[in-house]
Structure formats: structure tokens, C-alpha cells
């Protein structure tokens, strides 16, 4: 597993910790690209030997454009360098990004959004080809993290619309 600067946790430690997946942050089109792709390939090779999948994470710097073209290229490069799953960002044209990615793709939650907006983004992403979402602050900074986690689960696993999921969120939030 990589923190972008090097391997933070090698395969032996991942096995010892009973990891379900390893993650490597990559920097496509930015300083550190070659090194991060080398780390991804090495981590994916080790993971393949031991049956642990590797998540390739598309890092986006503040100066980089979050365009469909960039994400199509970046996600494909990660898959071609061994990622079994790719984590990227939702963008206009995401359906084409997901279609061009030869491995399952999940979206990052990004910056904190109002709950309904985060659910709408998750709903659109799933309907446009994402296999899941990897949200942090949109859950743990919510007024009801439990409600938001449940609502996201409904969108991803049960096909709820954003509005239906928001009702789940509100119900759990108001029951506390």
C-alpha cells in the first residue's frame, strides 16, 4: 500500500493485518507519475501472488483539470499497470469514463457536500457505470454519519434514488 511517496505497508504486513485490498495513490500527468506507477505495478504483482486485489487511486492536484478525457486516460493507465479496481472522481461524461475503464471503478466522495447533493452524485455515478463509492467526509462529517452510510448503501446496493435514500437518511437522523 502506498501513500504516494513510497510503500507504507508491504505485502507481508497486509497479509498479517488480514487486508481485503491494498491501495496505491498515483499521479498521472504530474510530478511523481513514473514512481507512483512503478509502486502500483509492484504492489499489484505482490497482491496477485497472494490473492489480494489492488485499488489504484487517481490523485488530482489542485492545478489539474478534472475532465472526462483526463479521467479516461488515468483510469485506463492504472488498470493497465495492474489495478484490479480504480478509484476516481465523478465528472461530466462519467459514463464514458466508466465504459473506457477495463476494471471496476468506484468514485471518491471528494469535498463535503450537502447530504442530498452527495446522494445525487452517488446515484448518478452508479447509474453511469460506477461499481461503488468511496466516501469519507460526506459520511463522517454528516449530521448523521449512521444515516448517511445507510443512505449511500441503499443507493449502491438497492438501487434507491437520491430522494429515496435521503428519506432514509432523514429518518435515521431524526430517530436519534
Range-by-range predicted roles:
Residues 130, 140-145:
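Substrate-binding cleft of secreted/luminal carbohydrate-active enzymes
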Residues 117-119, 143-152:
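Histidine/acidic-residue-rich catalytic or RNA/ligand-binding cores of hydrolases
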Residues 2-107, 112-135, 154, 160-168:
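Alpha/beta enzyme core
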Residues 137-141, 170-171:
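A short, acidic, flexible beta-alpha connecting loop/helix-capping segment that sits on the rim
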Amino acid at each position: 500500500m502506498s501513500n504516494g511517496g513510497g510503500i507504507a505497508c508491504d505485502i507481508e504486513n497486509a497479509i498479517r493485518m488480514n487486508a481485503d485490498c491494498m491501495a496505491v495513490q498515483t499521479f498521472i500527468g504530474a510530478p511523481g507519475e513514473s514512481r507512483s506507477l512503478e509502486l502500483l505495478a509492484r504492489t499489484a504483482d505482490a497482491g496477485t501472488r497472494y490473492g489480494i486485489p489492488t485499488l489504484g487511486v487517481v490523485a488530482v492536484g489542485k492545478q489539474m483539470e478534472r475532465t472526462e478525457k483526463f479521467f479516461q486516460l488515468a483510469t485506463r493507465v492504472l488498470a493497465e499497470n495492474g489495478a484490479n479496481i480504480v478509484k476516481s472522481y465523478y465528472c461530466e461524461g462519467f459514463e464514458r469514463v466508466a465504459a473506457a475503464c477495463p476494471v471496476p471503478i468506484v468514485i471518491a466522495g471528494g469535498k463535503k457536500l450537502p447530504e442530498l447533493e452527495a446522494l445525487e452524485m452517488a446515484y448518478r455515478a452508479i447509474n453511469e457505470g460506477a461499481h461503488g463509492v468511496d466516501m469519507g467526509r460526506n459520511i463522517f462529517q454528516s449530521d448523521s454519519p449512521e444515516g448517511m452510510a445507510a443512505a449511500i448503501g441503499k443507493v449502491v446496493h438497492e438501487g434507491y434514488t437520491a430522494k429515496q435514500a435521503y428519506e432514509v437518511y432523514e429518518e435515521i437522523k431524526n430517530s436519534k
